[in-house]
């Protein structure tokens, strides 16, 4: 077995990782894999409860991509069966169960996005209903006997809900058991997940031992901070970057992140060599590299992954045009004001912005106006009751730093 190859694989696998349980067993599995020429089976379970993937979700997918590059077997489990329960990890209350149809529709969308990162030819995708739906009640009782309620209540989220008198449904206890059983069904060598999934990943090790298998290695990836640099990236918090967003949206959002996130994003979200990242770190610390230029480099790397190098270059040009030269973008979405919005010959600006989908609510529009974040024809608006009169010429509206709208009154 080439020692250099073992060292190379370990360096790649350990990049950006938060924790490996246990690391010494990983080394032994890799040695055996290299000696026998047999790839390791690397598993990631995904419950398609929310079909839109953002960069936070891609941290584990990037790690899977690295395993693919090393020649190992990558298996994605679409948890169509477990998604009907919903992962209770970190939840304060029982989650609403999805219908089978909702799960399958979400799974289809998930697959399209996953293959923007992973090589479809090297990815095995399976649904865990293939084995979980076939379990008899006797099988389920046998599975449940492998773990105790006391051990389940060691989980922080369950313990907190139990202590506060919040209900915990029995079926929620089955979620980690079923995820662990996935590892048994696949005879997984390695399972990936976020640090918040540690309990579930270790359940896989426990059950594999109970079923007479060699236990898997649990590799935990860190939870990615959102664009605010504080809270985890989340759609509900509005600090996310979706992989289906336009290059312009991606570029603007990445340029808005705190400088402290630049190197972390490069390590976790790109394939830029660590030597390059470490060199950039030194250059930023010594003032040789401006953090703004480092962000441009990061933005173009990420946009190239999900779009193209040409799209990344164009997004940079557009960003410079809007933010440095204070010009308008080449393409601005248009909105034709419907007649029913016009009242007394005028239309309220907050209503138009909401109706056009530029803001999520009329109250958000009013808040942005009162904060001076809305410009009409490059003039700042402060009146929340500002009205637009029908005009032959369109109104150009800028909301915040990155949202633009061309308002047109039909003749």
Curated annotation (Swiss-Prot):
The species this protein was found in: Carboxydothermus hydrogenoformans (strain ATCC BAA-161 / DSM 6008 / Z-2901)
CDD domains given in the database record: S4 (cd00165), TyrRS_core (cd00805)
Function: Catalyzes the attachment of tyrosine to tRNA(Tyr) in a two-step reaction: tyrosine is first activated by ATP to form Tyr-AMP and then transferred to the acceptor end of tRNA(Tyr).
Domain S4 RNA-binding: 347-409
GO biological process, alphabetically ordered: tyrosyl-tRNA aminoacylation
Record protein name field: Tyrosine--tRNA ligase
Binding site for ATP: 235
Cross-referenced PANTHER family: TYROSINE--TRNA LIGASE (PTHR11766:SF1), TYROSYL-TRNA SYNTHETASE (PTHR11766)
EC number: 6.1.1.1
Subunit structure comment from the entry: Homodimer.
């Amino acid at each position: 077995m080439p020692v250099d190859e073992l060292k190379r694989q370990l360096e790649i696998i350990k990049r950006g990782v938060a924790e490996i349980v246990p690391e010494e067993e990983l080394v032994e599995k890799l040695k055996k894999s290299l000696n026998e020429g047999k790839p390791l089976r690397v598993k990631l379970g995904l419950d398609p409860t929310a079909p839109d993937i953002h960069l936070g979700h891609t941290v584990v997918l990037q790690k899977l991509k690295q395993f693919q590059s090393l020649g190992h077997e990558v298996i994605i489990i679409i948890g169509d069966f477990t998604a009907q329960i919903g992962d209770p990890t970190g939840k304060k209350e029982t989650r609403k169960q999805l219908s089978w149809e909702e799960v399958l529709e979400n799974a289809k969308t998930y697959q399209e996005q996953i293959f923007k990162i992973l090589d479809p030819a090297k990815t095995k995708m399976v649904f865990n209903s293939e084995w979980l739906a076939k379990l008899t009640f006797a099988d389920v009782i046998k599975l449940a006997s492998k773990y105790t309620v006391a051990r389940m209540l060691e989980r922080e989220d369950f313990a907190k809900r139990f202590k506060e008198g919040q209900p915990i449904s029995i079926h929620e206890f089955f979620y980690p058991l079923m995820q662990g059983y996935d590892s048994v069904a696949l005879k997984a060598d390695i399972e990936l997940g976020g640090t918040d999934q540690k309990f579930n990943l270790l359940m896989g090790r426990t059950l594999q031992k109970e079923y007479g298998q060699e236990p898997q290695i649990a590799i935990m990836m860190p939870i990615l901070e959102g664009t605010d640099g504080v809270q985890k990236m989340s759609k509900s918090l509005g600090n996310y970057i979706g992989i289906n967003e336009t290059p312009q949206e991606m570029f603007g959002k990445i340029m808005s992140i705190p400088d402290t996130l630049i190197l972390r994003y490069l390590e976790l979200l790109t394939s830029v060599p660590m030597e390059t990242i470490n060199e950039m770190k030194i250059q930023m610390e010594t003032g040789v590299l401006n953090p703004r230029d480092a962000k441009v480099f990061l933005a173009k790397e990420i946009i190239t992954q999900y779009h193209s190098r040409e799209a990344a270059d164009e997004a940079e040009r557009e960003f410079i045009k809007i933010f440095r030269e204070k010009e308008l973008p080449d393409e601005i979405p248009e909105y034709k004001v419907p007649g029913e919005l016009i009242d007394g010959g005028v239309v309220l600006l907050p209503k138009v912005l909401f109706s056009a989908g530029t803001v999520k609510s009329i109250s958000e529009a009013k808040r942005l106006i009162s904060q001076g974040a809305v410009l009409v024809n490059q003039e700042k608006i402060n009146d929340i009751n500002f009205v637009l009169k029908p005009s032959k010429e369109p109104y150009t509206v800028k909301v915040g730093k990155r949202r633009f709208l061309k308002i047109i009154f039909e003749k």
